[in-house]
């Protein structure tokens, strides 16, 4: 038989309250103490990935052009001594006058003498002598009882003499001739657009240089353009990721 059947329903809460009061006050069970400990463990993991790109090298030819202007001042003085003019001059970096000219041999301007035409003499002479000798044969003389002398013509010698003598003299004056050389300038390069400051030093880049020789003339082909600011650097990309994991143990 159950106790709940013996105790009326209105007395059941009172019975439970009495059982709670009769429980021991400490938690000891056979000298064993139960302690609950809560521990939190934090674990951090870091992964680093490095990606290296291909390294490229670019070489630029930079030509810096600067212009510097120099100013020179010249003073000249001409004096006549015994009818012979002498010219003296001086050059300085500051303004000078005729009073600053020192008449000495170092400052004298000497004109170079003009060259006279070169005289070439050519002489040509020819002499020829022709002599011709023609002998005449003697006729034979026959002997007879009655001998009649036959006149014998005298030996005749014909001499022909011809003397030719001529002397020709030719004088030629060599004159100096001046030939003007025509200078031609051809510009086939690219046209540079945009304003360029006169206060700065500009740079140009020259690339793809090649030479070709044709008929004794050397042609140089190259590409050039105005150089602006260029950044030549080796790029390396680094990716870094951090993974954090928190583990809680009860």
UniProtKB/Swiss-Prot annotation:
Disulphide-bridged cysteine pairs: none
Knockout-associated phenotype: Affects yeast-to hyphal transition.
Keyword terms of this UniProt record: Cell adhesion, Cell membrane, Glycoprotein, GPI-anchor, Lipoprotein, Membrane, Secreted, Signal, Virulence
GO biological process, one term: fungal-type cell wall organization
CC terms in the record's Gene Ontology section: extracellular region; plasma membrane; side of membrane
Entry membrane topology: Lipid-anchor; GPI-anchor
Prodomain residues: 232-250
Signal is among the record's keywords: yes
Signal peptide (residue range): 1-22
Subcellular location: Secreted; Cell membrane
Lipidation (GPI-anchor amidated aspartate): 231
Low complexity composition-biased segments: 111-173
Spans annotated as Disordered: 99-175
Chief location: secreted
Glycosylation site list: 64, 182, 208
Task performed by this protein: Putative adhesin which may be involved in cell adhesion and virulence. Involved in the regulation of filamentous growth.
Name the record gives this protein: Filamentous growth regulator 41
């Amino acid at each position: 038989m159950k106790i709940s059947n013996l105790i009326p329903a209105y007395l059941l809460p009172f019975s439970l309250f009495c059982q709670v009061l009769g429980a021991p006050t400490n938690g000891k069970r056979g000298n064993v103490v139960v302690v609950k400990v809560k521990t939190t463990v934090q674990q951090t993991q870091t992964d680093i990935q490095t990606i290296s790109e291909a390294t490229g090298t670019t070489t630029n030819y930079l030509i810096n052009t600067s212009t510097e202007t120099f100013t020179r001042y010249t003073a000249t003085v001409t004096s006549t001594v015994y009818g012979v003019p002498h010219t003296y001059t001086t050059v300085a970096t500051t303004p000078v006058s005729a009073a600053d000219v020192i008449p000495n041999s170092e400052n004298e301007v000497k004109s170079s003498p003009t060259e006279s035409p070169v005289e070439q003499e050519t002489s040509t002479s020819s002499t020829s002598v022709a002599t011709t000798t023609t002998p005449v044969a003697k006729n034979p003389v026959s002997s007879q009882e009655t001998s009649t002398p036959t006149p014998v013509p005298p030996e005749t010698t014909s001499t022909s003499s011809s003397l030719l003598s001529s002397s020709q003299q030719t004088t030629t004056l060599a004159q100096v001739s001046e030939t003007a050389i025509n200078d031609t300038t051809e510009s086939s390069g690219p046209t540079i657009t945009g304003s360029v400051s006169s206060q700065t030093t500009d740079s140009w880049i020259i690339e793809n240089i090649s030479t070709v020789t044709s008929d004794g003339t050397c042609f140089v082909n190259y590409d050039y353009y105005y150089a602006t600011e260029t950044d030549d650097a080796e790029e390396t990309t680094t990716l870094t990721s951090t993974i954090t994991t928190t583990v809680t143990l009860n």
